[in-house]
Design a protein with these regions (language model features):
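Short Pro-Gly-centered flexible turn/kink motifs
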Residues: 207-226
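Glycine-rich, aromatic-flanked loop segments that form ligand/cofactor-binding clefts
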Residues: 11-14, 18-32, 36, 169, ...
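Conserved, mostly hydrophobic/aromatic
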Residues: 88, 212, 326, 448, ...
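Conserved small/polar residues in nucleotide/adenosyl-binding loops
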Residues: 524-531
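Aromatic-lined carbohydrate-binding/catalytic grooves of carbohydrate-active enzymes
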Residues: 251-383, 399
């Protein structure tokens, strides 16, 4: 159930540690169990939630008889949904320091069988493309070390028998409830056993536990279907809609919105935005979203990021006045943020140069001319949360688009000692979740839409906070068919943001009839970015 490195199992392992004496051996033996009603929760992390009538929790305690290290395997059983969740708590009961080098959330073995697996690869503007490959002898893996779950591999996969299709065949699905760096591995060994492991990517991970300290892994959602991919997808759709998404928007019809980005980019004033909103209101559009460029010195993507103060000179009015004008048209008002990033040319960077993620003595690697803000630091989290809440309090804002337009490299935090730099990537994610939770606790009626250069962070972890995510920056109707098809294997249509966009399309140049563009996004959240 939870394989360990260094004591005779030579396949891919779920747990690898460095003991105080430098050895990496762990032998886990059964030490007890506990069964309870309801569903366990995980401190600081998103997870499936359910009450005592909907779920049971099984906890299996394992202990190393030599060192005293304890591992609690947690299972959440939602029987009516054919769902099992898994998570792990590692507790240092030894007499010395233990460093976790790998702590996966699950390990699953098939003792026999000939399997394939479905994974969902991609790139910017073409996310979650279905790929079906045999599980051959040896190791296969997907993952991300980009600081986020990424455009390139999604955290959902399916292991299936070879003849499985939409309506028949045996298949097993796994969805990682996390938004950061991850690794999902399969291995077929010399006697045709197959193993699947999923968890935080170990390449960027080393977590120190002093005696008495513990570490909680993120959660994995598991399901099985003997009726093909369709039934498996329905299981995941239901658990995400009802037991991951939260708040008043999880089952509520989302407003049809218009976003000014492709219509204006950075070139707008308050009057121009109101003009667009007025035309949209006459067509029945319900929400106007002001995108990038409303704050600081932000007339292009080279400056101003991090300075979350409205640029009243550019807008020609205060944020409240603009919001009131939009609301006066019978629409709701929304706004764009990218809180995890910072421009070198910004007041925030000049005031707090140590808040940017960069390695001392090295020139930082910029992407989209911007750096990452160190969300592993509590002072950074507190500052950003205060700024977000201040902006939200200043105007009638009903919706936030939360963007994240680059991957993380140069991973280093000035707040961590050298021996704890391997904790930075996961602490960053814990910080992000803390800020999101704080913002939504202060503004529970807010509709939050996730975005990461399009669909670069489309995962169950983010859906715990944002019930919809912008599916892709590719708004071409024909290419969206493939993107939305791949996404639908693991995620319900209610979570996918889609556009009726302008033609010729800004990504492909294709001219597609309005009826086609409308039909492609009809089942999804349906905005229009046109001017």
């Amino acid at each position: 159930e939870y394989s360990c490195f260094g004591t005779g199992d030579y396949r891919i392992s779920a747990l690898r540690v460095r003991n105080e004496n430098g050895s990496q051996a762990v032998t886990l033996c059964y030490a007890g169990y506990e069964l309870s009603r309801g569903k366990y929760s995980i401190p600081g992390l998103p997870a499936v939630y359910a009450d005592e009538t909907e779920a049971e929790t099984l906890g299996i305690l394992l202990r190393d008889p030599e060192s005293g290290l304890e591992v609690l395997l947690q299972y959440g059983v939602l029987e009516e949904l054919d769902i099992i969740t898994r998570a792990v708590k590692v507790v240092n009961r030894t007499m010395g320091k233990v460093v976790l080098l790998k702590a996966a959330s699950m390990c699953l073995d098939w003792l026999s069988g000939d399997y394939e697996w479905l994974t969902f690869y991609g790139k910017h503007a073409m996310e979650r493309t279905l790929q079906r490959t045999p599980i051959a002898h040896g190791i296969s893996a997907i993952g991300s070390v980009r600081g986020a779950s990424s455009h390139h591999s999604n955290l959902f996969a399916v292991v299936c028998e070879k003849d499985t299709n939409e309506t028949k065949g045996l298949c097993y699905g796994v969805s990682f409830v996390y938004s950061g760096e991850f690794l999902m591995e399969t291995e077929k060994d010399q006697i045709d056993q197959t193993r699947l492991i999923c968890g935080i990517h170990p390449d960027d991970f080393a977590w120190t536990l002093e005696p008495g300290e513990s570490f909680d892994t993120p959660e994995v959602i598991l399901s099985c279907s003997s009726e093909g991919f369709g039934k498996l997808s329905h299981n995941f759709h239901q658990v995400i809609r009802e037991h991951i998404c939260r708040g008043e928007w999880k089952n509520k019809r989302r407003p049809v919105l218009i976003n000014n980005w492709e219509g204006t980019y950075f070139n707008f004033t308050g009057d121009k935005l109101v003009s667009i909103a007025k035309d949209a209101a006459e067509l029945g559009v319900e929400l106007f979203v002001m995108d990038d460029g409303w704050f600081g010195k932000r007339d292009d993507d080279r400056s101003g990021l991090g300075d979350w103060f409205p640029n009243e000179k550019k807008l020609g009015c205060s944020l409240k006045e603009l919001g009131d004008r939009i609301v006066g048209l019978g629409m709701k008002f929304g706004i764009w943020f990218e809180p995890e990033c910072i421009s070198e040319d910004s007041d925030l960077s000049r005031a707090h140069p140590d808040w940017a993620v960069k390695i001392p003595g090295r020139k930082p690697n910029l992407s989209r001319h911007q750096m990452i803000l160190d969300f592993s630091r509590k002072d950074v989290q507190d500052y950003i949360l205060e700024r977000l809440c201040s902006v939200l309090a200043s105007a009638p804002i009903s919706y936030v688009k939360w963007d994240f337009n680059r991957s993380i490299c140069d991973k280093y935090s000035t707040s961590l000692p050298a021996e704890k730099q391997g904790e930075m990537a996961h602490r960053f994610m814990l910080g992000l979740y803390r800020v999101l939770d704080g913002m939504l606790s202060a503004y529970p009626h807010l509709l939050l839409e996730g975005c990461s250069g399009g669909g670069g962070r489309f995962d169950a972890g983010m859906l715990y906070y944002s019930p919809q995510i912008w599916c892709s920056d590719d708004t071409d109707a024909i290419e969206r068919l493939q993107i939305q098809y791949g996404t639908s294997f693991g995620y319900p249509v209610s979570t996918m943001g889609a556009h009726v966009s302008a033609v010729p399309n800004h990504q492909t140049g294709r001219v597609t009839p309005l009826a086609t563009r409308g039909c492609v996004c009809l089942l999804y959240t349906s905005p229009s970015p046109r001017d």
